[in-house]
Structures are given as structure tokens and as C-alpha cells.
Amino acid sequence: MSSPEPTNPVAVVTGSGRTRIGNLIARDLANAGYRIAIHYRQSHEAAEKTVADICSAGGIASAYPADLSEEQEVDRLFEHVATNFQRLDVLVNAASVWSPKSLEKVTAADVYDNFRVNTLATFLCCRRAGLMMSLQETGGSIINIGDARMDRPLADYSAYLTSKGSIPTLTRSMAVELASRNPRVRVNAILPGSVMAPPEATEVEQQRRRDATLVKSADLPHTVCHTVRYLIDNEFVNGTCVMLDGGRALLGP
């Protein structure tokens, strides 16, 4: 791990408490020397363990709880970041919810819950962080995590995929809005495939996942981390949604 200095860049990663893709992104950025703000909603113990792991490896990290669908809590989160770190260079919106449910059983409450976390929270964080970044000479980079399946939906995920389908439009809109305030603020998105296989997946299922891609490889979490770094580092990429599915979309259903 690169030893961070008090002037090193700062990254906020939402939904990074538990061992999901946000957590892996936060750890990867910490390894690159970023000072990390771990966001969680309920996973307090997991978030504190992540902070402890990063700090024991020589990094700098803090954990912050927030319900990101509540505007006041979003404001409070970024006020804490501004107070504790004095800057914000990267925001990765990785917080999300999903739960398979047949169309017959999906309720209005289910749809609302998906939009509340997957759409509204992403919007509120983009706006708050983006306006904060626009006041910095260095600008900043916002990366939204969408889903490659939004154009090739799976059954039983209608509420989830509908909410995730807003991410490309949200990303492009925020890119235009924020660039008009500071051209060094960029907003991009990653649309990954199933990067974290369920623990119970059999080898046959894993092989099926590999065979369903052009590259004949599983969607691995490190590919998302690499893409996050690319979008941070490449200052000429803005308003782009990177499809990260190994070419699966070209092979049909």
C-alpha cells in the first residue's frame, strides 16, 4: 500500500461497508494511496473492520453511516468529509439494493425501495459531491455503478433493473451540469456484469458464466477496480458509460 499523506486525494465510496464491489473498490483505492471515506447504512461492524484493515496497512480511512435517500443525511455525510479531509477528489456510487421477485409479487413499495437507493441516492450524492468538487480548482471524478443487464433484462428483476436503467441518463446529465460549472469535474459510469458470483455457485455454473462471454472469462471484481482507476486517471473521458461484461451483450440472451 502506498503511504498516504494528509494532502493525498480523498475518495468517498458509497455502499462500501460490506464485502461487495464497493468494499473492494475502497480497498483498491486505499492501496493506491487514497484517503478513504467508507459509507455504510447498517453494516457498522463490517465498515469498522474495513477501516481497521486499511489503517493497519498504513492507510487512512474513516466510516460514516447514512441513509443516502435522505437529503439531510447526504449533506451530513459530505460535510463530515469536508471537515475531516478538507477536499473530495473521487466519489464512487456503489450503494445499491436488489432482490429477485416475480412480477406477480412486486409491489409499489418494492419499486420505490429500488428507486430510493439505486436512483435517488445516486442523484443526491452526485449533486452534493459534484457541487463540492466544482469549487475546487482540481475538480474531481464521479463514477456511478450501473448494471450491464439493463439492456438485456433478467426475469424477476424488473424493479431493480428499471431503477438501474436510469444510471446512464443520470450520468450524462450530471456530466453536462457539472462541466458547465467546472470543466475538471467529470462523471462517468461502469455497467458491470455479474462480477461477484454467489458463494453457492457450482463449478458448472461458473463455467457457464465464463462461456457466456467473448473473452471466456468470469466477470471478476478486479476488472471493476481497474476500470474505476482508468476513469479517474483519464481526464479526457466524461459522460461515458463503460460496458464491462466481457462482450456478453454481443452473444445474445
Predicted feature residues:
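A short, exposed helix-loop element centered on a Lys and neighboring polar residues
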Residues: 126-127, 172
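Catalytic loop of short-chain dehydrogenase/reductase
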Residues: 15, 20, 141-166, 171-180, ...
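C-terminal substrate-recognition "lid" of short-chain dehydrogenase/reductases
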Residues: 181, 220-244, 249
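Conserved NAD(P)H cofactor-binding loop of Rossmann-fold oxidoreductase domains
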Residues: 94-100, 247
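Canonical Rossmann dinucleotide-binding motif of NAD(H)/NADP(H)-dependent dehydrogenases/reductases
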Residues: 3-37
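Substrate-binding pocket helix/loop in short-chain dehydrogenase/reductase
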Residues: 102-103, 110-112, 209
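Conserved Rossmann-fold SDR core element
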Residues: 87, 178-195, 237-244
